[in-house]
């Protein structure tokens, strides 16, 4: 089975919502069906992304403007080296986090999430064909995170996750597909697979 035009799919959600697992699992499901697909994550594994991960782990501090600039630089590399070449080669691209994460996580009283989205759009970054948002109560997400790893990242507190969830609700476009993150991972993967196939079945040959 081939796709006439590859699809760019983005997964968003607060930490602990299950989006990373979903991104990988859906890629596997599509590949099993003979639909060429690849998944990536932001921040990337390039030097620009490694720099950001140091910030996320609390190893370095960045002013808000520096954070935004760093994410924009990494996103340019993500598109140039990962996303666009894969789409051009005929593969669907499934991406764990994109510009909406930057707007939700890096916004504050001195920089609104809407302004961060505008900064991304001015860069002419590619708009996803499908945007999934895993919605989950921050308290449940935090409990999941506490069971998963010892070292917290700087945004993994209840107050921060509540702020981030609120910011997401402000900036996600109306066509965003919202998924209940309380559901089991297998159920969520199946739901997203059906949505993918239903929306783009006309493009299958």
UniProtKB/Swiss-Prot annotation:
Which domain of life, per UniProt?
Answer: Bacteria
Q: Name one GO cellular component term.
A: cytosol
Which positions does UniProt annotate for ATP binding? Answer: 13-20
Q: Can you provide one Gene Ontology molecular function annotated for this UniProt record? A: dTMP kinase activity
Which E.C. number(s) belong to this protein? 2.7.4.9
Any keyword Transferase? yes
Provide the catalytic activity annotation.
dTMP + ATP = dTDP + ADP
**GO terms for biological process, alphabetical:** dTDP biosynthetic process; dTTP biosynthetic process; dUDP biosynthetic process
Describe the task this protein carries out. Answer: Phosphorylation of dTMP to form dTDP in both de novo and salvage pathways of dTTP synthesis.
Q: Which family does it belong to?
A: Belongs to the thymidylate kinase family.
Q: What is this protein called?
A: Thymidylate kinase
Its source organism is Leptospira borgpetersenii serovar Hardjo-bovis (strain JB197)
């Amino acid at each position: 089975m081939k796709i006439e035009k590859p699809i760019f799919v983005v997964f968003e959600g607060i930490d602990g919502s299950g989006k990373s697992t979903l991104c990988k699992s859906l890629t596997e499901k599509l590949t099993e069906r003979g639909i060429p697909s690849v998944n990536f994550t932001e921040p990337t594994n390039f030097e620009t992304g490694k720099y950001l991960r140091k910030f996320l782990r609390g190893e370095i501090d960045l002013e808000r403007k520096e954070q935004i600039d760093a994410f924009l630089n990494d996103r340019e590399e993500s598109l140039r080296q990962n996303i666009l070449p894969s789409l051009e080669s005929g593969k669907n691209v499934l991406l764990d986090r994109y510009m909406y994460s930057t707007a939700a996580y890096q916004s504050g009283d001195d920089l609104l999430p809407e302004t961060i989205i505008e900064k991304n759009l001015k860069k002419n970054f590619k708009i996803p064909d499908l945007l999934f948002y895993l919605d989950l109560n921050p308290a449940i997400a935090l409990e999941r995170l506490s069971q998963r790893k010892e070292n917290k990242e700087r945004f993994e507190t209840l107050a921060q996750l509540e702020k981030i969830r609120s910011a997401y609700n402000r900036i996600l476009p109306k066509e965003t597909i919202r998924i209940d993150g309380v559901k089991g991972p297998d159920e969520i993967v199946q739901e997203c697979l059906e949505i993918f196939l239903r929306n783009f079945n006309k493009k299958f040959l």
